UniProtKB/Swiss-Prot annotation:
It holds the Pfam family Complex1_30kDa. It is a peripheral membrane protein. Complex I is composed of about 45 different subunits. This is a component of the iron-sulfur (IP) fragment of the enzyme. It comes from Beta trigyna. It catalyses: a ubiquinone + NADH + 5 H(+)(in) = a ubiquinol + NAD(+) + 4 H(+)(out). This is NADH dehydrogenase [ubiquinone] iron-sulfur protein 3. Coiled coil: none annotated. Gene3D superfamilies: NADH:ubiquinone oxidoreductase, 30kDa subunit.
Amino acid sequence: MDNQFIFKYSWETLPKKWVKKIEKSEHGNRFDTNTDYLFQLLCFLKLHTYTRFQVLIDICGVDYPSRKRRFEVVYNLLSTRYNSRIRLQTSADEVTRISSVVSLFPSAGWWEREVWDMFGVSFINHPDLRRILTDYGFEGHPLRKDFPLSGYVEVRYDDPEKRVVSEPIEMTQEFRYFDFASPWEQRNGNEG
C-alpha cells in the first residue's frame, strides 16, 4: 500500500467531524482536527489495520499570535508497516487544554512537556506535566512570539556560593551611540 492509498482510505473511513481540513502533497499528508477529536483520530491511525501509524516521531508547537487560536500543535506519525508518514495538526489558545496522548504513545510524555514548557500549551491527563528545558523558577514560555528578547533576570552559577543564583541584569548603559566614522581617518579634512 502506498502513502496516498492510506491517506485516501483514512479520509473515506473516518467520521467527517473528526477532520476539519486535509492536505495532500509530495512532502507528506496532513489532517487538521479539532482538539475534541484528537485522541480518537490518533487511536484510529495507530490501531486500524490499514493505517498502523504506531510510531509517534515528534510533537511540536508553533505560535501564530495573529490567530484567535494562536498555538498549533503538530503530531508527526510513522507507519513502519506501510512505510508511510502523516501529520496531524490541532490548534489551541492560552486556555484550551489538549488531551494528552501518553496513554497511546508513551514517548509523547517528553514532547508534551516540551510544548508546555516552551509555549504554555497545557495537556489534560498528562502524568508529569512540568518544565523540561527551562529552570523550575523560570517565568513565561520562551518560544512564544510575545516573550521578551532580553529578560530582566540573569540566572547563573555562582562558584564561590556553589549554587545557581538569580539576579537583575546589570546594564551599563541604556543607550549606545554608534559613530560609524573610522578612527583612522582624519577629521580635519587634511586627508592625503
